[in-house]
Amino acid sequence: HIRFLGNRADVGELYQAMDVFVMPSLFEGLPVVGVEAQFSGLPCIFSDKVPEEVEFTNKVKFVPLNDEKKAWANIVIAAARDKTNREMPELRNSIFNIEKSATLLTDYYKQLLSRV
């Protein structure tokens, strides 16, 4: 089912309730919502009109918009049935990890302070 929920403050909770994130866009820049969905552990299905730079995990598929509806449906169903770990260690080990980000920021501030 598709539901338009309007402006929300509880997006993280909504992602946790989803099985799959689907973005069949005709045009996109870099969709932050697609990045958020991946970092929530969701498998993501994007149209081929979404730039590949949005891919941060191995749970992303790009599907041509001109593919048959049935092909899209089969890909979404397969992604929903895939119950592999949504925690995704590759995210935990990435530069987006909070501990690594904090270390990078601390090092940056130390570098700035050393110039004073």
Q: Which residues fall in each region the model found?
A:
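A charged, aromatic-enriched C-terminal amphipathic alpha-helix characteristic of glycosyltransferases
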Residues: 83-116
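Short glycine/acidic-rich beta->alpha loop that forms part of the nucleotide-sugar donor binding site
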Residues: 11-14, 28-31, 38
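A short hydrophobic beta-strand element within the catalytic core of glycosyltransferases
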Residues: 21-22
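An anion/phosphate-binding loop that grips the pyrophosphate of nucleotide cofactors and donors
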Residues: 18
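Aromatic "clamp/platform" in nucleotide-sugar-dependent glycosyltransferases that forms part
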Residues: 7, 26
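Nucleotide-activated donor-binding/catalytic signature segment of Leloir-type glycosyltransferases, i.e.
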Residues: 1-6
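Short hydrophobic beta-strand element within catalytic cores of glycosyltransferases
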Residues: 34, 43-47, 52
